[in-house]
């Protein structure tokens, strides 16, 4: 059985660890990065099946990192889900315009996370 790899790019340690814990609980392998630049490098080398990315990070924003990933043949096809605590529609529009597949509002429940994973990894089925 294939185990999907999910990259979590989040500068807030508590938030990143919570995301990683929930994703592992759902049966996925997790790769973590604590800023956008490191996240882009890990995406290029690890080739994850899906990326969760914070929109606001100090060294490189989620928007800029998404643009970088969309410019690479290695990562342009990987679903990117932007995560934000900001509910304003302008952030959703900016994320989708730069190439993200979806936007989720933090905090995220386990069920919401599962729904997003099912939506963007269509070959996936979960028994929960």
Roles of regions detected by a PLM:
Residues 10:
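Conserved acidic carboxylate
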Residues 27-34, 42:
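Short hydrophobic/Thr-rich beta-strand motif most characteristic of the beta2 strand and flanking loop
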Residues 16, 58-61, 76, 88, ...:
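The feature encodes the CheY-like receiver
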Residues 35-38, 61-67:
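Acidic catalytic/metal-coordinating carboxylates
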Residues 17-25:
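Charged docking surfaces used in two-component/phosphorelay signaling
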Residues 46-52:
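Active-site beta3 strand of CheY-like receiver
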Residues 20, 64, 87-104, 112-115, ...:
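Alpha4 helix (beta4-alpha4-beta5 surface) of REC/receiver domains from two-component response regulators
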